[in-house]
Structures are given as C-alpha cells and as structure tokens.
Amino acid sequence: MTLLPLSATAQEKSGNKDSEDEYKKSAVAKNYRTNMKAKNYGEAKKTIDNAISRYEEAAKDTKLYIYKIEALNELVKQENRKIYLNSKPDTVSFFNNIYELYETGLKCDSIEEVLLTQKRAEGKNTKNKLRGGIRNYLLAYRTNVVGAGKFFYNKKQYVEAFKFLDMYMRTKHAPLLTDSSVATPLNDPNDRVSVSTIAVLSAYASSNYRGVMTYLRESLTDDNIQSQIIEIGCKSAAELKDTTSMLLLLEKGFEKYPEVDYFFMTLMRFYNSAGEYDKALATVTKMVELYPDSRDYNFMMAKQHMMLKQYEQAVKSFTNCVKINAEDAESYSSMGNIYLMAAQDVYSGINVSVADPKYFEKKNAMREYYKKACTCFELAKKFREDKPELWLEGLREVYFKLNKGRELRSLEKFKK
C-alpha cells in the first residue's frame, strides 16, 4: 500500500473544503426564488444575508441586494396587510424591516456607484441603472421612517428613535434620493428643524453625545425649546471634552436666557476655574442689573470683587445685601474679613518711628478698621450664633487688638 505524504493529504482535504464552500450564485438565486414563490419571505431574505456575509463576491453583487430589497418589501407589505385585515401587525418588525430596506438600498447604490466610477475612469459612458428602482422602493416608506422615529421616541426607546430619525435626515441628501436624473423626486415636507429637534432629544436621552452635536445646529432654530436645546448642547460638548463648543453655547445661552440658572452658574464656574475673574464679574454684574433686589446675585458680585482684590466695591455689594436682608450674617462676616485684611495691611505698612506723626495716623486708621470689623462680626454673631465659623475667629482677633478682655473671655465657651 502506498502512503500519501501528510502534506498532500491535508492539501487535498483543504481543496475539498474550498470546493464545498465555493460561492454558487445560481444556487443562491434558485433558493431565493423558491422561498419567494412559497411566500417564505423571511427565509428568502435569510438566504441572501447568508451569502452576503459568507462570500466576498456575493457582498459586491448588486443583484443580491436587489433580491434582499424585494424580500424586505414583501415582509413590510405582509405586516401592512394585517392592518387592513383587522389583524394585529408587528409594528416593531414593520419598522425594522423598513429600516433594513433603507440600509440595503443605500448599500446597493454605493456598490453600483463604485463600479460606475471605475468604468468612468476607463473612459466609458455609464449611468446608474438600479438607482431609479431602488428609490421607488424607499420613497414608498418615506413617511414611515420618520414615523418610526416618533413612535420609538414616544415609547422612550431613544436609541431606536435616533436610529430612524438619523436615517431620515441622512437620506435627505443621499444621491440615491436626490439624483435629479431620476424621475421621482424626493418630496419631504419642510421638517428639518422639527425632526432634528427630536433627534437631539433622543440622542441626549440615550447618552449619544456625538449624535446630539450632529443635529444641534439645525435644532437650535426651534424657538419653542431653544433654551433646553442649548443646555443639551452645552452638556454634550462637555461630555465630549469640546470646551470651545461648550463655552460658545454657554455664552449664547446666557446672552439669550440669563434667567436660566444653568447658563449663569456654569458660566461662572467656568470663568472662575479658568482664572477669568473679570469675565465672571461682568456676568454676575448683568444679573445684578436685571435683578437688583436679589441678595444672592449681589453676594456673588461682592465675592467676585474680592477675587479681583477690589475690596471697596466688595463692601458696597455686601452692604446692598444687608439692605435687602438686614439679618444677612454671611455678608456681615465677609465685610468683617475685609476690614480685618485692611487693618493687617495698615499694620504691615507701619515702617516709621513712633516720633513720626504718620505713625499715629496709621495706628488710628488700623484701629478704625478693627472697630468696623468688630461691628460686622458682632452682627454676624447676633443673627447666626449657631454658625460660629462666621464670626468666632474674627471676634477673637478684633477683641484682642482692641483690648476688650471681658468680651474676649466670653468667647471661650464657643467652639468653631
């Protein structure tokens, strides 16, 4: 008995396997037609899907995609017929088959376009032969695509909602539907803004921040919920680490909707964290101008002045706070701290001898600041004795500096 070399045996087995796995277009087409004739549209589609996923040649064969479109169209019509027969249709399958029909049509058109581009490069005069037919299939379900997006949005299935709305918007520009050489025109209503708005809301609700940014510009023209859309854009840009877009949207939102806390507060945090205290001051100043009787905006304005070391202006703003609310312990405490700093600055600047008249001028100025600080801290204590962190350390210092021993001892029972 003659033994075959191991390598030859393996090669023969490999060859047999390749032969068994060879793409047979005629067999695929026959299987497809058999299932279509028997109205087994799901099986017909599965036959094409298997061939496309398994064989490279099949994946580039436009004829197979046309077959798949036909099968999908029958599946859609099958569900549609149930409506007229008072039978319960599978709405989700109905919509998903339409979506897949669109995907398949776009894929088929792109494959044909690649082939035509190659032929044109060779100097051949060619045109799309399949585009018109595919377009007719897609246009038949045009309203269903956007309808599916709204259906899933109302069901709070936001990933699915965005998928359909995105398909609807993308295909508004697809050559497959906009090619003027094809007789049937794309006749969408003027719904770009409304559909973009729902797409943005769906994308944000499903944490699809890139999806938000894709349709944000269009949706920003929707005046009905513009402030909400701008806020969504800001938050999405922040998630994407797109600081430039986030800041532009924040500034736009604050300019148009200063009453929306999100724009104001986020802008303030951004400017302060970036060390742009002057911009933060300008922002809060606008709010004080709009709401002069707001204690909170006046208080924030005072704090911004302090960050810029504009202490006199800060005291004026804190004074406005206590005019609005005479028991504002925080503002009294803040003014006390400013007067303490002023006293300490005077002390550090005393570099003249006791014999110099300026020495006593500075000592008196320092004492006046301590007195003002003392008054402020005592008022803070009066109105918020339960919050010693506002006044305890300040009073200890001013009582010591003003030689108020009895008052200083009275503070021993308090703990910060």
Where are each of the predicted segments found?
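Canonical tetratricopeptide repeat
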Residues: Y67, S181-P185, D191, I198-L201, ...
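TPR alpha-solenoid repeat register
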Residues: L64, L177-S181, V195, Q228-I229, ...
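Canonical positions in the second alpha-helix
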Residues: A51, C108, Y168, E218-S219, ...
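Short coil turns that delineate tetratricopeptide repeat
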Residues: E56-A59, H173, N224-I225, P258, ...
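Single-residue signature of alpha-solenoid repeat helices
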Residues: A44, I98-L101, A161, V212, ...
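Short coil/linker segments at helix-helix boundaries
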Residues: N73-K156, K163, T171-V193, M341-C376
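Start-of-domain marker
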Residues: E12-N80, L85, T91
